[in-house]
Every structure is written in C-alpha cells, then in structure tokens.
Curated annotation (Swiss-Prot):
It holds the Pfam family DUF436. HAMAP family: UPF0340 (MF_00800). It comes from Latilactobacillus sakei subsp. sakei (strain 23K). This is UPF0340 protein LCA_1354. NCBIfam families: TIGR01440 family protein. It comes from the Bacteria. Disulfide bonds: none annotated. Belongs to the UPF0340 family.
Amino acid sequence: MSINLNQIKQDLTQITNDVLTAANLRRGDIFVLGCSTSEVVGGHIGKASSREVGATIIETLLEILKPLDIQLAVQGCEHINRSLVMERSVAEAHDFEIVSVVPAMHAGGACSVAAFEQYSDPVEVEHTVAHAGLDIGDTAIGMHVKFVQVPVRPSLDTLGAAHVTALRSRPKYVGGPRATYDI
C-alpha cells in the first residue's frame, strides 16, 4: 500500500480533534497513543513498521497537543511490556515508575522510536493514567486510560489501512437512589 503522508497528517488531525472535543481535556492532562504503523501501511501489526509514518504521526500529534499543554504518552508494543514514552518532567510530576529501556523499531515500534527522538528529555514509564487516548491499529490502550473509560467514535474510523478507536474517561458515578450527577 502506498502511503500519502500528507493525507495521514490531515486525517490524523481530524481524528485527534474529534477525540479532543469529546474528551474535554484540560491543561496538563495526559493523552495516550497506541499505534501500529504496520497496520497504517496495510501490513500486519508488528510486521511492517514504518519509521516515516511513525515520525509523521508523532510530529502531527505534538503540533496539536503542545499548544493545548496536553501531554502525549506513546505506548510501545508488548515486547517492552507496553511501557510508554513521555517527557521526564511529566513522569516525575506524576511520580510514574521510570523503566530502563530505549524503544527500537521491533521492540516498542515506530511511534515510540519517533517520540523518543522528538521529545526533549524522553523516558519510558511502566504505566500511566491518561485522561483520553487514541488507538491506531487495535493496539489495546485501555490499560493506560483511567476509569471510567468511555468509547469515542471519531468521524474517521481508519488512518491509512489501520482501524481507529479512541477512549475518554469520566469520573465514576457513586451513590444510591438519592444521588444526582448533574451539576
């Protein structure tokens, strides 16, 4: 499959803006990305990673999220236990467990590699509690999005050849028959 990087950027911008609108994030919130560039280019997850596509995806997300002061955490593959790349300042501010690994194309994936290259002081963390996230290629980001997770359906459900889903979170409803939830 031939990939048009400009189209990837355009579609990803639309998808991300849809998720941001639904998630109603605030400054400092964490947005997690799970992405298989193999799936984006029409391959099987983990079998056709694209450094070019990974770099384009991370660059595009940072262009959108940085001005909003929303922090991007990029999930790696199972070969690095789905650890995430984030800026050291974010990891330290949230007291996330920093782990010793540097992502590679086939141990972390192209987006993790791109994030590690594009961040100013990248680290890998074992786990995060994001407020929303984007899953490109069915990579399973749910373990990194805080409860209660709510599916978001962006206006586009594919990026390249990859299936796209998203999550936002909301506070848990607690109480009994007398409780109200609207303020």
